[in-house]
């Protein structure tokens, strides 16, 4: 995983250009419902996906009553809402590979929205499997840099069964195999508390540097529009903004 120290830059994560809080909550609730419905148990101790969903909800301060309502909804046999997990893959301008993960109750609607977004911002939606070979599918756990030294966190990660850690000026980013994700997350949560973020995602094997402000803004606009869709859970790309472009964009109102 070397070369991904600017992880926040690469993925264009939560910040000023992210979706509104209400939309974040909608996505969290949907993930809780689908995890409870499709998992082997409604007990998070026996359902890793549900446990991960509940951890993500706590990280984002989703109110407990809304979590309980989501769990009750999943257990309600009269609830006919059925969500399908879909992964869309395509290219933005300049050959940037994009992966979009979605949960939808209407595949045609979601596909049309995603395709329209790609087209509007100069990209093209491809077939599933067209770009995923450019990424590593793995678990990601992030803690603030001041939680402990890189050496201490690395020791904990090795003990827990994780396979890599990248530390930059603000964040320790831990990577795990998917099958070990829940175990590593549980171990680190017991040692360091709830992380800033944790999820299973697509991390680029190599990144394309964007050093042009206009190209960067168009790419980030595509990511922003995709993330605003209620059906879209996460967006990943194999890009990285150059330091100069990143600072310019961060400095804009």
From Swiss-Prot:
One of its GO terms (cellular component) is cytoplasm. It is found in: Cytoplasm. InterPro entries: Integrase-like_N, TACO1_YebC-like_2nd/3rd_dom, TACO1_YebC_N, Transcrip_reg_TACO1-like, Transcrip_reg_TACO1-like_dom3, YebC-like. GO terms for molecular function: DNA binding. Keywords: Cytoplasm, DNA-binding, Transcription, Transcription regulation. Its main location: cytoplasm. GO terms for biological process: regulation of DNA-templated transcription. It comes from the Bacteria. Belongs to the TACO1 family. This is Probable transcriptional regulatory protein RPR_05505. It comes from Rickettsia peacockii (strain Rustic).
